[in-house]
Amino acid sequence: MENKILFIGLDVDNKNYHAHAIVENENVGIDFRSKPNIHSLIKMIKEKFKENYTFHFCYESTYSGYFLYREITKVGHECTIIAASLIPEKSGDKVKNDRLDAEKLAIYFMKGLLTPIYIPTETDEQVRALVRSRTFIKDQQKEIKKHAVAICKQLGWNYRQDEKESSSYWTQKHKNWLKEKLITASEFTKFNFKIIEAQINDLEERLNQYECEMRRISELPEYKEKIKALICYRGIDILSAMILITELGDTRRFSHPKKLTSYAGLDIREYSSGGQQRKYSITKMGNKFIRKILTEAAQNYNRIPVIGKDLRTRRQNIEPKYTEVADRCMHRIHKRGKHLWHRGIAVNKVKTACAREMLGFIWESLNLVTN
């Protein structure tokens, strides 16, 4: 006789683990609460359910990540991480607490109403954390640079007005201009910019270290072929390809590009009824890192679809099956972008539409590798 399944919903926080255990095809379960230690919780459940049961745990995807999943599976129990945004909600249910959350998870899990998420390997998770840290450092550096430019404007130092052109900030020319301004500045301003410059240089050094490590990782066997498939796209270099690969994971789990579009939050919100159609902005209910990289890569939609010097260099020794998909993508988003632009669509909307198109081709390229 097979063991009965015990469905266990977990609500996890820093202070307590709340659990609700319910036997399959039964209506009443039992609540548990323990200190934040999964082994203590499992011990409590086993003391209550002394018969032989197969434990099926589930919990929402939260800040706890995959650590709890690996702790549970390590001791021989099954565990599923649930997509929090896809948990069914009742409009009349206005009471929420940890105990009820755990109960709802257990009941919905037993009825098969929950959607599991993809679990990466430990190596993929660690590499993704490294890549995200590099993005975090880069964002920090941008904020400090913006702060420095704001201070200059408060002091009446306007670089673009002085140079009589729309020059970019933080070029060598801009740095030389700033040094000249600081010669006659007060001691407080000199001290302020000395610290700011040290911060910017320190973050630049950290960025270089991260990027060197990412380039080294890109040569590993599990990433090398995927990198080749992506760097033949215009607008995607090795660093951008590493971000896409680590964030997308195994693309075979997406049976159609539309599902990948939803995962990236590039779907268009729609509220249509009867003969009336209402479409709004993109949902943004998905991976922001993928959206950002693709939008940046799609900036070149209005350029003539030709293979430039840098792209030709990146495409050396890459199989034709990858370059063929990338070329189709380049021509497609150029045609699509021009069409939307001539219709008078806002530039940012055009870029987003091109990014959505591009994601479908990337799905095809990565599936060529995995298949």
Which stretches of residues belong to each language-model region?
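Short alpha-helix plus adjacent loop in nuclease-associated cores
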Residues: 81-118, 276-284
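Basic, amphipathic alpha-helical segments enriched in Lys/Arg and hydrophobic/aromatic residues
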Residues: 335-338, 342-371
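Glycine-rich, often acidic, oxyanion-interacting loops/wings at catalytic, nucleic-acid
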Residues: 135-227
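Short glycine-rich, Thr/Ser-proximal phosphate-binding strand/loop in the N-terminal lobe
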Residues: 13-40
